[in-house]
Amino acid sequence: DTSEQGEHIIEHVAASLEHRQRERGLADEQIIGVGIDTPGIAGRDGVVRGAVNLGWEACPVQEQLKMRLQKKVCVCNDANAAALGELWQGGGRGYRDMVMVTLGTGVGGAVILNGKVLAGAHGIAGEIGHMTVFHKEIERCACGKYGCVEQYASAKGLIRITRKLLEKKDPYTVLVDTPELSAKQILDAAKRGDRLALDAVEVLGKALGSAL
């Protein structure tokens, strides 16, 4: 629920955590702390900034969850957390250096050097979602800029591009007259050789390739 600048998200997260705790029959004293990963800039102060997809300009996630759950809370950028997970138990096992790109509602990125996250001054050294790749874009990104990677290579971006192609091209595609278009539908259509879906995926690939 991202309404009202995402002010209900923390409560939903806390309720979900408590539900999982009850499901597993864990007592409070068995819970040492809580780790949360989130889009946006997760500062060392526990404040998440610039998580535009959640409606957060500056949300004190750590403080609010700590007060709500009465537990220690650690907040980490979602791409950094995913990269550490891959390094530990996934595709990065056995390596000390890696780059990871996450594609979902938005676009994230992380860099691991010598087994540690390259954070940079503000914790977002690996983030590529709001790099400008198409300077002639006329639609504004949620961040306020134009031509960001996320406008093309995210799930929302893929849907946006597909809708624009549906307006311009011969609508001989399985995607025509699809009221609730999803990224999965587009990708499935591309796998089946649908020309318009393939064109949309090509735009995604060019944007991501330019950023990398």
Positions of the model-derived regions?
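Short glycine-rich anion-binding loops that position phosphate/pyrophosphate groups of nucleotides
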Residues: 39-42, 104-106
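Active-site/binding-pocket entry motifs
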Residues: 40-42, 138, 164
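Glycine-rich phosphate-binding loop of actin/hexokinase-like ATP-binding domains
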Residues: 93-152
